[in-house]
Swiss-Prot record:
This is Polycomb complex protein BMI-1. Component of a Polycomb group (PcG) multiprotein PRC1-like complex, a complex class required to maintain the transcriptionally repressive state of many genes, including Hox genes, throughout development. PcG PRC1 complex acts via chromatin remodeling and modification of histones; it mediates monoubiquitination of histone H2A 'Lys-119', rendering chromatin heritably changed in its expressibility. The complex composed of RNF2, UB2D3 and BMI1 binds nucleosomes, and has activity only with nucleosomal histone H2A. A motif (Nuclear localization signal) lies at residues 81-95. A zinc finger (RING-type) spans 18-57. Component of a PRC1-like complex. Identified in a PRC1-like HPRC-H complex with CBX2, CBX4, CBX8, PHC1, PHC2, PHC3 RING1 and RNF2. Interacts with RNF2/RING2. Interacts with RING1. Part of a complex that contains RNF2, UB2D3 and BMI1, where RNF2 and BMI1 form a tight heterodimer, and UB2D3 interacts only with RNF2. The complex composed of RNF2, UB2D3 and BMI1 binds nucleosomes, and has activity only with nucleosomal histone H2A. Interacts with CBX7 and CBX8. Interacts with SPOP. Part of a complex consisting of BMI1, CUL3 and SPOP. Interacts with E4F1. Interacts with PHC2. Pfam families: RAWUL, zf-C3HC4_2. GO terms for cellular component: cytoplasm; PcG protein complex; PRC1 complex; ubiquitin ligase complex. Induction: Down-regulated by oxidative stress. The keyword Oxidoreductase does not apply. The lineage of its organism: Eukaryota, Metazoa, Chordata, Craniata, Vertebrata. One of its GO terms (molecular function) is zinc ion binding. It comes from Felis catus.
């Protein structure tokens, strides 16, 4: 499979930033007439003096433009997950604001409005965050025995697990290299890191896995690994080479049969050429060894010296061609 294209956050900035303040969306709000989004405070302040969209100049509403704007929670979650540290910094600003202005009306707001929501509650993971994970050997037979397992088997399963604390930006490829070096697995075997029964791609980070499989932080991120041999392709290539060598040996034996005393007898084998088809020499670097005579192929045999001795030689005397025999 082809690797998934990964783009930079700067390429997505036009879709994540407010044109009114130039920053990333905070409390993203969308105009329902044209679907352009802005920060909530930015668009509310703008619509106090205008009734048109700041981007496309479409009329939001004739008299009450605030009726045609909606909070976009999905877009805001995307911004928080794509921009590292944005959610944590925003929550800190809100806590500092209400601490400096205790008279501000925050009782009617939600915990997020007051800045009292942690990253864990929002399920937002940053690149520098440390993720706890557990990894164990994937055994298909163990899964089949789950129905009839006895009291000692759960202890074995617990002992097989290993617990790690890794940064969220760590990739599956790094985890595979760690397992190979830690367990001395030779290079002739391939390691697959899995979530449940699905192999994970090498470029997945732990943060990607947590988002894709909706990790709830109610325990370590459960991962598994399996080891399998990687020499299958080499076996296929060896078989192909063996077939090729066998074909060459068979063609050589066919040419030898043509020069043998029984070579003049017609053969029913499909490996031999037809009388009208010239046979190429099995030694391309010496094309003069094989020649086509009367539709049959002759190749060097045990008496090839006598054939060269009886072969006529051409010589040129005063521009005329004369043929002499040895």
């Amino acid at each position: 499979m082809h690797r998934t294209t990964r783009i930079k956050i700067t390429e997505l900035n036009p879709h994540l930033m407010c044109v009114l303040c130039g920053g990333y969306f905070i409390d993203a709000t969308t105009i329902i007439e044209c679907l352009h989004s802005f920060c909530k405070t930015c668009i509310v302040r703008y619509l106090e003096t205008s009734k048109y969209c700041p981007i496309c100049d479409v009329q939001v509403h004739k008299t009450r433009p605030l009726l045609n704007i909606r909070s976009d929670k999905t877009l805001q979650d995307i911004v928080y997950k794509l921009v590292p540290g944005l959610f944590k910094n925003e929550m800190k600003r809100r806590r500092d604001f209400y601490a400096a202005h205790p008279s501000a009306d925050a009782a009617n707001g939600s915990n997020e409005d007051r800045g009292e929501v942690a990253d864990e509650d929002k399920r937002i993971i940053t690149d520098d965050e440390i993720i706890s994970l557990s990894i164990e050997f994937f055994d298909q037979n163990r899964l089949d025995r789950k129905v009839n397992k006895d009291k000692e088997k759960p202890k074995e399963e617990v002992n097989d697990k290993r617990y790690l604390r890794c940064p969220a930006a760590m990739t599956v490829m790094h985890l595979r290299k760690f397992l190979r070096s830690k367990m001395d697995i030779p290079n002739t075997f391939q390691i697959d890191v899995m979530y449940e029964e699905e192999p994970l791609k090498d470029y997945y980070t732990l943060m990607d896995i947590a988002y894709i499989y909706t990790w709830r932080r109610n325990g370590p991120l459960p991962l598994k690994y399996r080891v399998r041999p990687t020499c299958k392709r080499m076996k296929i290539s060896h078989q192909r080479d063996g077939l090729t060598n066998a074909g060459e040996l068979e063609s050589d034996s066919g040419s030898d049969k043509a020069n043998s005393p029984a070579g003049g007898i017609p053969s029913t084998s499909s490996c031999l050429p037809s009388p009208s088809t010239p046979v190429q020499s099995p030694h391309p670097q010496f094309p003069h060894i094989s020649s086509t005579m009367n539709g049959t192929s002759s190749s060097p045999s045990g008496n090839h010296q006598s054939s060269f001795a009886n072969r006529p030689r051409k010589s040129s005397v005063n521009g005329s061609s004369a043929t002499s025999s040895g």
